[in-house]
Curated annotation (Swiss-Prot):
The lineage of its organism: Eukaryota, Metazoa, Chordata, Craniata, Vertebrata. The modification Omega-N-methylarginine is found at residues 26, 58, 60. PANTHER family: HIGH MOBILITY GROUP PROTEIN HMG-I_HMG-Y (PTHR23341:SF1), HIGH MOBILITY GROUP PROTEINS HMG-A AND C (PTHR23341). The gene is Hmga1. It comes from the Eukaryota. The modification Phosphoserine is found at residues 9, 36, 44, 49, 99, 102-103. This is High mobility group protein HMG-I/HMG-Y. Belongs to the HMGA family. The modification Asymmetric dimethylarginine is found at residues 26, 58, 60. Coiled coil: none annotated. The keyword Nucleus applies. It is found in: Nucleus; Chromosome. Residues 21-31, 53-63, 78-89 bind DNA. It comes from Rattus norvegicus.
Amino acid sequence: MSESVSKSSQPLASKQEKDGTEKRGRGRPRKQPSVSPGTALVGSQKEPSEVPTPKRPRGRPKGSKNKGTAKTRKVTTTPGRKPRGRPKKLEKEEEEGISQESSEEEQ
């Protein structure tokens, strides 16, 4: 009886080893580089000195943090087109708004 137990444990261990080598990770499997006959001919025709174009960088450009503040940029609105977003208050309008609020409280 002890012999049968030892025999059953050995095949299980060997199966786990095989599975472990076949299925490593849970993620997406890596794409295997396949060489088709059509692409092999094109590759041999290319010049070895030709450098492939590098991929464009993603995300924010490196120097974008060093831009000037919003005050230095001049916003030009074309006539006949509504400005987008919340309208900006000018200093004159802010003073008028304060004076109107105080007069309403008095009444």
